[in-house]
Amino acid sequence: MRKTKIICTLGPSTDQEGVLRELVANGMNVARFNFSHGSHEEHLGRFEKLKAIREELGKPVAALLDTKGPEIRLKEFKNGVETLEAGQTFTLTTREVEGTKEICSITYKDLPQDVQPGGTIMLDDGLIKLQIITVNDTDIVCKVLNNGKIKNKKGVNVPGVHLSMPYMSQRDRDDIIFGAQQGFDFIAASFVRTAQDVYDIRNLLNEYDSDIRIIAKIENREGVNNIDSILAAADAVMVARGDLGVEIDFTELPGIQKNIIERSFSFGKPIVTATQMLDSMIVNPRPTRAEISDVANAIYDGTSAIMLSGETAAGAYPVEALKTMSAIAERTEQENHARFVPLTENTGKISVSDATAHAACLTAKDVNAAAIVTVSESGNTARLLSKYRPEQPIIACVMKEQVQRQLALSWGITPLMMPLAHSTDELIEMSTSLAKENGYLHNGELAVVTAGVPVGVSGTTNMIKIHMVGNCLATGVGVGRENADVTSATGKACVCRTLEEVRAKFKPGMVLVVPSTSNEMLSYVRDAAALVVEEPGLNSHAAIAGKALLKPTVVGAAGATSHIRDGLMVAVDCAHGSVQRLQA
């Protein structure tokens, strides 16, 4: 089960017949809608298509609205594209002109007031570098420092300069309101500079009674410098390496990425690593070796999610890119499974819910639980568990579909819909049964269950229970699990403590339950449906006999002759080393 989540950007490539369905079916956790491009009508068409597919396939794929943000872009060239040459002059102007090789209009009217001669301007994610020569009220005359082609509406970055433009434009307001009204799950807020930028969006969402969660995209120096206050304000953060790698010295980028991921752990917030992760797959069917390492290293660092941009939005191999990223993640996680994050000495006082989540993760590790099951109204308990990166999968049982989708972004969480429970016993039974029905738990396995008491009160996570799944009577080690024909059997229990009891009571087809076996007992073992033995060891007489005679066998079933009632109908499951009582 892949624990690192994957975000895929939708676009022209995913509009092709069947592509979006393939993305949903092959593990896309979050669908990104890039509102820097396209109209509301265009995005709504894709959103409606996504909703229909996720409903049909039963996949809780979240929808993420990525805002345009306070960005600056070129307007349009007469020919759509121009080639700039090193040494020539090129003018950025706030006047409305037809773009040529010498001049082009920009979208931000006050840029001439924010820059100075000698400063640097980058075009198209830094592919073309300009040095400012002179500035007047409308024009910024620059020297081109390297050759390159430039197209319509490419980005303009001004590294190290605080822009006086307001954070939220009218366009962004309209887009955010659209997202709130349509039922999007996340807002990815572009170019967040301070915590106040996040609060401004939160206040707007509150006006529309929206529970959309906010992902703060870190794309400039101000965002990096204010990362702690931004993490405190936002619901998640994204290392948006495209613009960030232009706004800062690119040699700083790897260290900043690692630091932001590390800081996100301290705040218990999901962290997304994005931009150019499999960029070559826009045109090629396979990634470069460097891209494979890039994805893997982000996972080694502990990122919650990884993102595909142009690879799925406009690439030639969108489904292949997703499958490739998923395969890299799964393989990397096999070697990185022990990344449990302990509480550190300088953590300070934490909440009861946080302490309970940490204790649940430790308990699951100590008892080798198959899963951690949590019941949460808001999803916050599941996110706290995710913060500690336990080895066990986190099965989050929630009551609201939007909460289920929003948990799709968090590392290691599998969210399931569950009706409201009315008591603690009902909560435990319903949640573990739901996990079992969906194949995440099996009879005889241990689950660590955490929830809040009293039931139904949000924010009161304070209970941990170690729960044995099913009507389990005994557990041990299954023998012959590699042979699919002998992994399970059912029958009436014949509980015997001596060979004389076996001779007196046993009938063919029974499940023989004994302290140990011997050569004198082999004829009875041969006629038994299954064998349950208290003596441990895969080299024990019972283990060898059971394997040789192709009998479902569980050894090391401590207390089996005491816990299993003679004549009871039982099921022996070698795959999980358990003996279950069958319902009458």
Protein language model features and the residues they cover:
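Structural preference for beta-strand elements that scaffold enzyme active sites
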Residues: K5-I7, V30-R32, P60-L64, T89, ...
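Short, ordered loop/turn segments at secondary-structure junctions
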Residues: L10-P12, M28, F35-H40, T67-P70, ...
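Conserved alpha/beta-domain cores
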Residues: C8-S13, E42, V161, P166-T275, ...
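Glycine-enriched alpha-helix->loop->beta-strand junction motifs that scaffold or abut catalytic
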Residues: A25-V30, Q181-D185, L205-S210, A232-V237, ...
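C-terminal helical cap(s) of enzyme catalytic domains, especially alpha/beta-barrels
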Residues: L44-L50, R202, T312-E335, M463-H467
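Feature captures the catalytic cores and cofactor-binding loops of soluble hydro-lyases/lyases
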Residues: G38, R46, Q392-P393, C397-L427, ...
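Acidic, glycine-rich flexible loop/linker segments
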Residues: P70-S169, L434, Y440-E500, V525-A528, ...
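Expand to "…catalyze enediolate/carbanion chemistry for C-C bond making/breaking, isomerization
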Residues: M1-P12, Q16-E17, V24, S39-E48, ...
